[in-house]
Amino acid sequence: GKYVTIYQGLKQRRPDLRIGWYTDPLRRDYWRAKKLPGATEYKAWQSENNDLGAIMAPFTDVYFPSVYWFYPRTTHPMEADYLSTYIHENLSEMKRIRRTYGRAEAPIYPYVWWNIANGSDVPMPLDMWETMVRVTLDEADGMVLWGGYQQPWDENAPWWVTIKARLTDKRRTG
């Protein structure tokens, strides 16, 4: 499709560019990912990802899956327990697609956001944000921080303090 045409056209003009697509070729999924491998729903999710991965992964130099979180603890208290599972399973599935259809050297940089992604602009509880940062940086090659549009910069914002602490720890511990 059009992804392939765009990729090939860009590469003809600029072979040095590393091209990736927001979310694709992985269909972000919370409900099926938390079922874990082997479940019928999980296998259906993998099948959808296979269909898209077979087309797109060969034409992807860097992967940008999205692991935004949609469920406030106040209205979905049980779902918070699955945050690390959701991130882990989505990144594991992205790695499977890359391994099966793409290039092993292509990095994975998930999009993350410190707000609950349900249209409310409410920050994630700090413990959940720390979990998101830890799991993402432990299992991916980095991350893309999303958000902050038309917001004044706050050096002491809890989300930023968490990022700085994690990056400092990474450098100190190698």
How would you label these PLM feature ranges?
Residues 13, 55-58, 101-104, 137-138:
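Extracellular/periplasmic catalytic domains that process cell-envelope and extracellular macromolecules
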